[in-house]
Amino acid sequence: MKGMSHEPKSPSIGMLSTATRTTATVNPLTPSPLNGALVPTGSPATSSTLSAQAAPSSSFAAALRKLAKQAEEPRGSSLSSESSPVSSPATNHSSPASTPKRVPMGPIIVPPGGHSVPSTPPVVTIAPTKTVNGVWRSESRQDSGSRGSSSGRERLLVEPPLAQEKAAGPAIPSHLLSTPYPFGLSPGSVVQDSRFQPLNLQRPVHHVVPPSTVTEDYLRSFRPYHTAEDLRMSSLPPLGLDPATAAAYYHPSYLAPHPFPHPAFRMDDSYCLSALRSPFYPIPTPGSLPPLHPSAMHLHLSGVRYPPELSHSSLAALHSERMSSLSAERLQMDEELRREREREREREREADREREKEREREQREKEREKELEREREKERERELERQREQRAREKELLAAKALEPTTFLPVAELHGLRGHSTEERPKPSEQLTPTRAEKLKDVGLQAPKPVQHPLHPVPAPHHTVPSLISSHGIFSLPGSSATTALLIQRTNEEEKWLARQRRLRQEKEDRQSQVSEFRQQVLEQHLDLGRPLVPTEAEHRPESTRPGTNRHEQGSREPPQHFGGPPPLISPKPQQHTVPTALWNPVSLMDNALETRRAESHSLHSHPTAFEPSRQAAVPLVKVERVYCSEKAEEPRKREATPLDKYQPPPPPPPPREAGSLEPQTFPHGPGPFLTELEKSTQTILGQQRPSLSQATSFGELSGPLKPGSPYCHPTARGPDPAYIYDEFLQQRRKLVSKLDLEERRRREAQEKGYYYDLDDSYDESDEEEVRAHLRCVAEQPPLKLDTSSEKLEFLQLFGLTTQQQKEELVAQKRRKRRRMLRERSPSPPAVQCKRQTPSPRLALSTRYSPDEMNNSPNFEEKRKFLTFFNLTHISAEKRKDKERLVEMLRAMKQRALSAADSVTNSSRDSPPVSLSEPATQPAPLETDQPVGVPASLSDVPKTTETGRLEQLRPQELLRVQEPAPPSGEKARLSEAPGGKKSLSMLHYLRGAAPKDIPVPLSHSINGKSKPWEPFVAEEFAHQFHESVLQSTQKALQKHKGNSALLSAEQSHKVDTAIHYNIPELQSSSRVPLPQHNGQQEPPMGRKGPPMQEADQDSEEDSEEDSEEEAEEAPRRQWQGIEAIFEAYQEHIEEQNLERQVLQTQCRRLEAQNYSLSLTAEQLSHSMAELRSQKQKMVSERERLQAELDHLRKCLALPTMHWPRGYFKGYPR
């Protein structure tokens, strides 16, 4: 134990090295408790050397033995109790008893030899040889544990060969042994390496196992509490604990926590141990019963009958008392047989292990050579890549610098790690015992990149597993006994030395290959930064963390190692990483081993504890190697101590971090330019390894750990954002982009730019323009002829689509419903007649922005350009004012002229006959356009008529100006019902003028002759019609009068009206000139007209002309365009307002209701309070009255009382 690093005396259950050596140094889980417990357990504790001296050591030793046994066993009988006595807990336990063969366990245990052991640190190194496993059962184990130091000595002496054999196998610390699977792995989960005796976790040493650590294995191995019959030998043999063993395991004091009161557990029944369950039972409180190996226990269990060899006479007596001699003998015989079998098995296993180790070593060397060749090739590739990358990097260096601080730290750490791993890796391999190390290396070789990885990982494991490593390294843990420890140590060290030599050689090669590999990987990673594999690798890595994670190669060989007991020993920390349970995918590891490894290193640095999934990969890599390195741990540890110290202030990283955590601490120093490290790495082996490691880490971290998936990802991880990965070459984080991402981005760009994007690679830029041009062409073409075929409509109906016409009808229906609901006056049918022809939107157009606000909006110019698409123009403030003035004039005129307008219009108008419906629409002409039109029409109309009319109008110049235009406009509108509707909306806008306009159109008689009846009918009809039609729109229009939107709408309307007028005006013979009206400068015509009109209208005309010109420039009619949009919008707004009103009224009603209800509630609560207070008053009053009553009663009752007394007194008299 001394040799082993006790540093972490904490039980390094997880620390068993996977090294072929089953030998593991284990610190007793609860050394002092063990000692105390053992001693308390009874003098036997002291008597059993191990118990006393190795109390901690013993439980620990027991655990170690167990582990060793298991490690050995795994091959033969991973956990089969029979195959390896160790494997069956009972057997293991009994092994101490049975071990007696080798040495009288009892006596030996009892002898103070055990005491000598105590001197050794609690940690016990158990070198499980195959025999050792047997020894567990066999004396070697027992002496180490149960037998006690003397037995241990004897065993050491007697079993030195065993010890040595075991030495080959990992010596398993008792605590490890105690935990069936120190890693908390279920026995099944741990695939035991045939090389290593499986740690027979099943047969965990109870003492070794913290009382609470009862694993399934224990339970499984231990029979449930059986009746004495059940517990009989039949079960015992599997249990592997004969009474003696049981006694060894369960000292009475051990049993004290829960003596086997249960009949099943009676020591009487050899099977009370029933797989010696109790030892594992948490029964012994950790303090009370330090887990002790049965051998360590060597306390007599009162209930257990020790085999004669094992037990003192007293023990024997105790046992015999409780156990039938028959069962004890049976147990003993079984144990003996088992032990014999175990010993043989262990020997075979040891031989196998040795053979395997040799094989592995050779394999590793071969692999390493292959790896080196591969690395050299990769190096060449990497050089090319690097040059390429450097160019890119130079470009991105600036960006990288920004990111560097974050990423580089981890990188530097990684470098540090790498350096360590380089130094230590060779040792780790050696430590690992060539077998394991070689295996690792072989695996590494198998996986080109992985080889280096193990090297990197090893250092980390060293840091992480210092104590374990020390224990491993010292496999000669004094725990077993000085001799055994020495033998084991010698064996281990010889193996280590060989392994080290081998490793040093390999490591040099590996370092070089790693440097090249690292470079290549950097390049690859750079190329594959987006590779999703990395995260997977990270996940896989965690599993491989134990051994495989070190490299892909490791990954390939790792699973076995992982399953082998030792890696799991270290694995417990890996358990930190969640992933360890998952099976890592060697394939993925191989591909992304570097990346993963990098990720792991990073993870380690960044988030040792968090590492978990990502760290699994990173840490495990390092960890695994380290674990393997544990055999050479001493050296590596020493070496590491320095490097670790350099890199990681806390050489013993928190267990959670394990190797990984080690790394983070280890490499606090800034990553430093990763590239620089890389360059240095070429120069220095350490440098090389470190860069590869750091790169691996950075890459891995970036690709793997950075990935969000990796829990390990630490904030520190370079890629806090999983989307970002560290680009080694660029030395900066760059966004991780997958092909899918690129595809999506391209598609989105194509969408935005309006070209078609196909995933087809044949698609190239040249096509883009064509496609765009085609799309533009399609978009700009006039719309196709309306196709209302039933097929198409049915198809569209599937999507809830229909034709505009049907939509209009539906909208009209809705409007009717709304009107009915709101009792609005029904608008004139023509409004709905043509699709959206009503220019109502014009009036409806409203906005909460003031024109000035809109004029000052940032994208004002863009908006103006947009309007030009629709032949609309922006109206400047002056124009708007003019228009507003015009509108006001029109309104005034309308009001003034309403009366005169009829006659004026009748007499002055020679307009084409207008159908009644047309007149209805005509009012719109009044719009500003009409004013323009008015001058034109006035000038055009025969001067006589005009003059007369003008004169009439002069008094009302405004009227007159407007009127002439209205007539023409009206006529035009009348002729064009649709146009009329549009104008109508305008008219509504200029509603004031509309009334007189209406009369005019109505009054127009055919050929300009006014038919007396027509004016009346037409006027009345039109008037009413317009009134109703315009009523709703008027309000909106008036609201919007000031708005530029309205003005623009007006303009467009004017244009429309002008166009409309053209026909009617042309129709009216008197107004031949009106055709000029065609939305062309009507104002000019107006100017020709009477000067008065001209003057009045000049300003109006100017503004109107401008707006008209702008509005009329394009054939607005073709696409209802903005007007239709405005109209739809208007409808939408109106509906919204309606809805809002309904809801508001509802809301108000509800509020009122709520208020009244709340008032009522308040009143009620008040009345309730009053009632309550009254009730209280009543109660108190009642109580008061009652009290008075009682008082009165008492007063009245006293005499009553006396009466009877007196009565009685007197009665006898």
From Swiss-Prot:
Keywords: Acetylation, Coiled coil, Methylation, Phosphoprotein
Keyword Acetylation: yes
InterPro entries membership: GSE-like (IPR022207), GSE1 (IPR042337)
Taxonomic path: Eukaryota, Metazoa, Chordata, Craniata, Vertebrata
Modified residues (Asymmetric dimethylarginine): 305
PTM annotation (N6-acetyllysine): residues: 496, 739
Region (Disordered): 1-154, 326-384, 527-579, 630-719, 816-858, 898-979, 1065-1118
Skewed-composition ranges (Low complexity): 51-63, 76-89, 103-114
Protein name: Genetic suppressor element 1
Keyword Coiled coil: yes
Taxonomic source organism: Mus musculus (Mouse)
